Amino acid sequence: MTITLKSEADLAKMRVAGRLAADVLDMIAPYVVPGVSTAELDRRCHDYIVNVQQAIPACLNYGSPPFPASTCISVNHVICHGIPSEKTLQNGDIVNIDVTVIKDGWHGDTNRTYLVGDVGVLGRRLVDITYEAMWRGIRTVRPGATLGDIGHAIQSFAEAERFSVVREFCGHGIGRGFHEDPQVVHFGQPGKGLTLEKGMTFTIEPMINAGKAALKILGDGWTVVTRDRSLSAQWEHTLAVTDDGYEIFTLGAAERERFSPTGHQK
């Protein structure tokens, strides 16, 4: 495992990339409505990243087989890596949009789950609990804490709410690379795993299912779905370990009204 501790100059670049990624999710929010296709949402995000932000969408042509879009858009029982298509969103859907922007060689990665129209009680509760689970993990971050502390905070909260945590996919280190060490799993035991140090940068991005945790990957090689077709939600932020806690690079506009980058409520 090779972990690159970031300098202050590096972190300044990551703040820019993270803010751009968050801005994409703010920009697209008004368009997430019944009747819009996920392909149209992807096109809007792509155009904004390339033409307005003068940045690069990291997902496009990433991996093997090459991912065919600039964003991952995952609807209802799709856990992650949903491929945008001409299929339209329906009233009551939940939809996750995952964006990674490259600016001046540095990555900013964030995602959020949106409510489409009038969403039922279970869907709204799942989205809210997943958001809070992400924050439970984030709030454990400080020098001397461990990856197990993060995972335990997420897992214990989600399971107490009678939801399940996806184990096969996780957060990750990030910087000049899209996916760097370490892997940040969303389950674990307190005090176990890698000890956090100032200058580490990574994502926390729990995927929480309303049903069981079991999943399968579809034939396209990318789309991950719940095996029992239960709803799944996800939220993600990119952050750095600081002297005494953390700094989040990907807060959206509404979050910036409520929280400082260090997570303190305003």
List each language-model region with its residue ranges.
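Active-site neighborhoods and metal-handling regions in enzymes and metal-associated proteins
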Residues: 1-266
